[in-house]
Amino acid sequence: MNILKISKQTLRNNIKIIREYIGNAKMCFPVKANAYGHGIEDIVENTHDLVDFFAVANSLEAFRVTAVAKNPVLVFGVIYYEYIEKMISENIRVSIQDYEYIEKLEQIAKELDKKVYAHININTGMNRMGVDYNDACRTIQRAYESDWLILEGVYSHLACADNRDHPTNIKQKNRFDSIVKFTKGLSQDIICHLSNSYGFLGQKGICYDMVRPGILSYGFLPEFYVDRVIREIKPIARLLSKVVKIITLQEGEGVGYSLIYRGFEGEQLAVIPIGYGDGFPRELGDRGFVNINDVMYPMAGRMSMDGLTVSLGINEYDVKVGDTVELISAIPRNRNSAFSIAKQINTIEYDIMSTLNDRIIRKII
């Protein structure tokens, strides 16, 4: 059995540290992509009393949140009409991505005789989603004056927050500042929010009314940040499995598809029942590391859909069937941490964690 063990204490401590850091700003906790691979229901159930909002990518994720918590839920993505009635009935917050969408929302709200909570997404420079910056004030005014919309928030997203010195950060902040000024002229109660994890850590004066610390809440820090308080944030999860078989190679034998790994006579290999079919990165095959009984062992041969092998050498530490295998460590400096794995295969921690699928059991401890 493969288990992602999640520390409730570490998770809650991370959020408390963030809340202290952001002061009076509200916290919107992103739990999209199955809470970055950690499991939406478990994460929401164990944090709902610490955060103001949750945020997700789509309607189906929003329904998973509302099933276990009463916090407001903001959907970042485009809303599909087959779900809009249920979303409105559950007071799920809708993102307005263009001016024309307001009229469509109003029509549905009238039919249901229920107002829609909305946040307007403004494109200040990422050029992915959102109302064009030049059309922002008109759209905000229109939504604010609507009889069927409750304009709860206005937001944008930083394109280069992971590079705190990038000039686009200042450009986007300046644009958003002008949007905030216009919005607050309509109502001081409208929540303005721009910052993700890297945003509020890397830029000053950018918390506004609310921040959206996703990856930071799960314990992953930007390399550039060395603040003593924030450095107390830790990864919340470890990925564990078991040794299910020990194999001894004969002279000239290899292991795995195409037998790309050729061992030596008498070499022992441990078989671990996890593979790319579980969302574990295939690129790690033949170059990743796992921890068994506090000893690091290299992966050997290509990873398959349902399993991988590691070289025990002559097995001087007597690894046995049933021994626990740590595939992802919660200690960032370890060779098998999500941070180290991401560096090794040229990706990011988000990718490593969010692709772990439901063949892996999540367990809060």
From Swiss-Prot:
It holds the Pfam family Ala_racemase_N. GO terms for biological process: D-alanine biosynthetic process. Disulfide bonds: none annotated. Substrate binds at R128, M305. Its cofactor is pyridoxal 5'-phosphate. GO terms for molecular function: alanine racemase activity; pyridoxal phosphate binding. One of its GO terms (cellular component) is cytosol. Its EC number is 5.1.1.1. The active site is at K32 (proton acceptor), Y257 (proton acceptor). Pathway: Amino-acid biosynthesis; D-alanine biosynthesis; D-alanine from L-alanine: step 1/1. The modification N6-(pyridoxal phosphate)lysine is found at K32. Keywords: Isomerase, Pyridoxal phosphate. Coiled coil: none annotated. It catalyses: L-alanine = D-alanine. Catalyzes the interconversion of L-alanine and D-alanine. May also act on other amino acids. Belongs to the alanine racemase family. This is Alanine racemase. It comes from Francisella tularensis subsp. holarctica (strain OSU18).
